[in-house]
């Protein structure tokens, strides 16, 4: 039950953050909002790291992969923070639902996973659902849609890299 509540709280916080980014986007740039978001995130992170044993627990055995993960995560966050004030959130969310398609496709070369026809079928059905939500046949593609797609791809790479890094570097491996 605790996991369900944690997930619900996390989703509510992400939705609140996205709405705040949209609302504050006319007054603040993406970098300013990213800085504030990161500063707020540092407070609970400080207590988590401190409780787990200090800075030694965040030392990575894969620093280059970790650096690439940080860059792709930064690119994703910047892309979303740039786009949210400039286009309807519902459209940005719908485009970002392409992430599972990217993740499954990236898991094959990056993680060496074998993806069977059932999983590909499920991903394709989900992607068709995304297309139905977007109704691309009724609108022209705006360049901001491409920014969301790039941010989504960057997010997907970051997520797959996190899984790859977890194979060699864990909190206990420091």
What are these regions (language model features)?
Residues 1-9, 42-68, 117:
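Membrane-interface interhelical linkers
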Residues 1-2, 35, 58-62, 135-154:
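Juxtamembrane helix-entry segments on the extracytoplasmic side of multipass membrane proteins
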Residues 11-19, 46, 70-78, 100-105, ...:
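Hydrophobic/small/kink-forming positions within alpha-helical transmembrane segments
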Residues 22, 30-31, 45, 140-174:
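Transmembrane alpha-helical segments that form core, pore/gating elements
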Residues 26-32, 79-96, 167-172:
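Structural motif at transmembrane-helix junctions in multi-pass transporters
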Residues 99-121:
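C-terminal transmembrane-helix exit sites in multi-pass transporters
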Residues 118-134, 155:
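Hydrophobic transmembrane alpha-helices of multi-pass small-molecule transport proteins
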